[in-house]
Curated annotation (Swiss-Prot):
Cited CDD domains: RRF
Organism: Myxococcus xanthus (strain DK1622)
Compartments reported by the entry: Cytoplasm
Family: Belongs to the RRF family.
A Pfam family recorded for this sequence: RRF
Chief location category: cytoplasm
Listed name of the protein: Ribosome-recycling factor
């Protein structure tokens, strides 16, 4: 019964870490990354459609993304969606495809982005600590209901703490790696 608490905690921490990684792929660095466009939806015949569903998206150069729609009639809608997405990048439409040139980030902008990354990491640390609190509450309830012994409670609480520490360490590593990527010129 109590092993389930640890397994569930580990699963939820892993999901949180995956969520952090996903969120950070959308953070703009000095390089062109097609992941930044994942949240962009294009009005395709009245239906909000992911950009990848209406066009081919490529990063042929480190500071350029090209978007070639499968239907030329969608070009204006794609351009509109990109402008509304507030990516901080000005789309250039040449009638055939859209180019997204990524200008080099200024030192000040890189520091702002690094600060956002750090804030996002702190949010995920709080999430992991809340998961620990939930697991500990389940264990207390099990102890109170005599489903586990005092010794089991103490032992499992230590395992829960180790899982939490490991999760927070991973958050720190992910954030540090992303900050380094952002600060690279």
């Amino acid at each position: 019964m109590s092993g389930d608490v640890v397994a569930e905690l580990k699963g939820r921490i892993d999901k949180s870490l995956e969520g952090l990684r996903t969120d950070l792929t959308r953070v703009r660095t000095g390089r062109a990354s097609i992941a930044i466009l994942e949240g962009v939806r294009v009005d395709y015949y009245g239906t909000p459609t992911p950009l990848s569903g209406v066009a081919s998206v490529n990063a042929p150069e480190p500071r350029l993304i090209t978007i070639k729609p499968w239907e030329k009639s969608v070009l204006k809608d794609i351009e509109k969606a990109l402008r509304e997405a507030n990516l901080g990048i000005n789309p250039m439409n040449d009638g055939e495809m859209i180019r997204l040139p990524f200008p080099p980030l200024t030192e000040e902008r890189r520091k702002d982005i690094a600060k956002q990354v750090k804030t996002k990491g702190e949010e995920f640390k709080v999430t992991i600590r809340n998961l620990r609190r939930d697991a500990n509450e389940v264990l207390k309830t099990q102890l109170k209901d005599k489903k586990i012994t005092e010794d089991d409670h103490k032992r499992i609480t230590e395992v829960v703490q180790k899982q939490t520490d490991a999760g927070i360490t991973q958050v720190d590593e992910i954030v540090k790696k992303k900050e380094k990527e952002v600060m690279e010129v």
